[in-house]
Amino acid sequence: VCELREGGHHSGNWGGALADPAAILAHAIATIISQRGQIQIKEWLPPPMSNAVREALKGVELDGGPTGPRVDRDWGEPGLTPAENVYTWNSFAVLAMLSGTPASPVNAIAPWARAHCQLRYIAGTDVDDIVPALRRHLDEHGFAQVEVQPPPAGNAAGFSASRTELDDPWARWICRSVERSTGVPPAILPQMGGSICNDLFTDLLGIPAIWLPHSYTACSQHAPDEHILMPLCREALALMAGLYWDLGDRQVEHP
């Protein structure tokens, strides 16, 4: 938030003499993320990707189908594929931004500007230093007037990032079960970009957590026309039926 004064002031009388909070906030955000989506705060970067993870993602493509968005291959961390950027790297996004009244603008210097931003992070990121690092970064770049506030109550929920390692015995066992059910080796994602409370299992209970897909990424989740595809539902039923069968089959070796 950049709030400089109370009320707007006529741009013809005060333009050039009053600082523009929207311009200040836009420049502040531009120091956080580059024009190509690369995070500029070093404390926000995750640990380097392991060779095992890179190998697992080899050949994995982001494809939302005919209704999904086109992938911007020049966005994100340079040198990473789109899949690696989503599943092995942190990402920063401006969820909403406002100054003045966009639907009915007036000739006035706005008193404030506000942006709701988000950092999606993977396991290994120093969560406790995310906000302090942002504050230090803004101060070092001359943006002391930009205030960092907590998210609104309706969007304040958060989960700690977690990961079940690729060489976990249960991860390998489930891969074999899925391949038995489908006849096709599964694509393995080391972690997801979404907000999932897996840390309750991996960190609190100390057990592996593994997810099997029941939908696809272009399902308009949390948006109008959220939907599922029946072929994927049928495949998901087969995956889960095969998995539970193998769990109860004494002829199948278990970890």
Segments predicted by a language model, with ranges:
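Metal-dependent amide/peptide-bond hydrolase catalytic core
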Residues: 1-231, 235, 248-255
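C-terminal alpha-helix
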Residues: 239-247
